Amino acid sequence: MNNYGTLTLGAVPIGDPKDASLNLIDYIINHKIILVENVEVFNKLCKDLNIKTDARIIDYGSHDIPDEAGIYIDMLKDGQDILILSDEGTAGIIDPGGRLMQIARQNQIKVKVMTGPNAIIAPVVLARFNRGFYFHGPTPNRDERIEYFKKLQNYELPMVFFVTRAYIEDFIIDANNYFGPDRRVFVCSNLTKQNEFTTFTTLKDISQFVISGDINFSITLVIDGKPPY
């Protein structure tokens, strides 16, 4: 049994600050080291929650492990606990923390996850497809995306994609070509925020939204699997 510290993957609200758990608030207040994806976003969260922390705040700032990973591992081996937070949702899934978590486990360091808001589960629940799902996350460049779509054409489970504003039009065009215009899709953005957007429709109709300019923000798409199920 070692005396290493614990790496905790935190879960922050995906929109509404009131979704913050008591556990999250307690961890922010009492942790001495907190790795964050963006300091400004973290400071705003603390302001919204009306809390203060004396923790050392480190801007992780990357979706991959930074060169300083060894420093964090040394901190943990020295018995210091570290909390890592993404800007929204649970850290570690297509977010800061995933690679660090792997390295921590390789070094026999305890890793725990905080339950709470999740940017993947909420869209899946709202999509109402009521089955398992395939999570892809951010879409790759166009050539790689087409190869993915070819492999997923006959997949029967719903598929979850994160699409940034800059690539929405190309994504929807490719999705129509490879999944078909009549494939059902749930689209959402800014869940739990005042400007929340949700719609349950088809890929063909989503194309019209994009062409008309009604969708000009980053979105999450849950594309239904190939029928019959």
Language model feature labels by segment:
Residues R99-Y155:
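Class I SAM-dependent methyltransferase SAM-binding "motif I" and its flanking Rossmann-like core
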Residues D59-I65, T139-N141:
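Conserved helicase motor
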Residues N23, D67-Y72, E144-Y148:
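Short acidic active-site motifs
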Residues N2-L7, K77-D81, P158-Y229:
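A contiguous loop/helix-start segment that scaffolds small-molecule binding in enzyme catalytic cores
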Residues I28-I34, Q108-V111, P158-M159:
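Short active-site oxyanion
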Residues E68-M114, N118:
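Glycine/small-residue-rich loop that forms an oxyanion/phosphate-binding "nest" at active or ligand-binding sites
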Residues E40-F42, G89-T90, A119, Y167, ...:
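Alpha-helix capping/helix-boundary segments
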